UniProtKB/Swiss-Prot annotation:
GO CC list: mitochondrial membrane; respiratory chain complex I
Keyword line: Electron transport, Membrane, Mitochondrion, NAD, Respiratory chain, Translocase, Transmembrane, Transmembrane helix, Transport, Ubiquinone
Residue spans crossing the bilayer: 4-24, 60-80, 86-106
InterPro entries: NADH_UbQ/plastoQ_OxRdtase_su3, NDAH_ubi_oxred_su3_sf
Record localization: Mitochondrion membrane
Name this protein carries in UniProt: NADH-ubiquinone oxidoreductase chain 3
Topological type in the membrane: Multi-pass membrane protein
Gene Ontology MF annotations: NADH dehydrogenase (ubiquinone) activity
Location, primary (coarse class): mitochondrion
Native species: Drosophila yakuba
Gene encoding the protein: mt:ND3
Function noted in UniProt: Core subunit of the mitochondrial membrane respiratory chain NADH dehydrogenase (Complex I) that is believed to belong to the minimal assembly required for catalysis. Complex I functions in the transfer of electrons from NADH to the respiratory chain. The immediate electron acceptor for the enzyme is believed to be ubiquinone.
KW Translocase (keyword) present: yes
Lineage: superkingdom: Eukaryota
Oxidoreductase in keyword set: no
């Protein structure tokens, strides 16, 4: 039993040394400035931070976030179905989905879902 632990330790040590040597030998001498800079959604981090930002992109993001939270609220309703009255569950679900559909209709009617504007 003790010999198995020693053999596993030696294999681990050899593997670690080989990986360390491979990483040292494979490094490039010149590190590219663009490759080492952080990437943030296509924005250049080295330029001015006061660039114009698309309000439409921001609003689409907020709409997505709202509907994503609403989906997270809908999913537990299936689990609640086992423990609650079917009539109360149905009425609650219909009201919740109607509120979602009214919100979606309002966003559509206001033109927030049209990307071409």
């Amino acid at each position: 039993m003790f010999s198995i632990i020693i053999i596993a330790s030696v294999i681990l040590l050899i593997t670690t040394v080989v990986m360390f040597l491979a990483s040292i030998l494979s490094k490039k001498a010149l590190i590219d400035r663009e490759k080492s800079s952080p990437f943030e959604c296509g924005f250049d981090p080295k330029s001015s931070s006061r660039l114009p930002f698309s309000l439409r992109f921001f609003l689409i993001t907020i709409i997505f976030l709202i509907f994503d939270v609403e989906i997270a609220l809908i999913l537990p309703m299936i689990i609640i179905l086992k423990y609650s009255n079917i009539m109360i569950w149905t009425i609650t679900s219909i009201i919740f989905i109607l509120i979602l559909l009214i919100g979606l209709y309002h966003e559509w009617n206001q033109g927030m879902l049209n990307w071409s504007n």
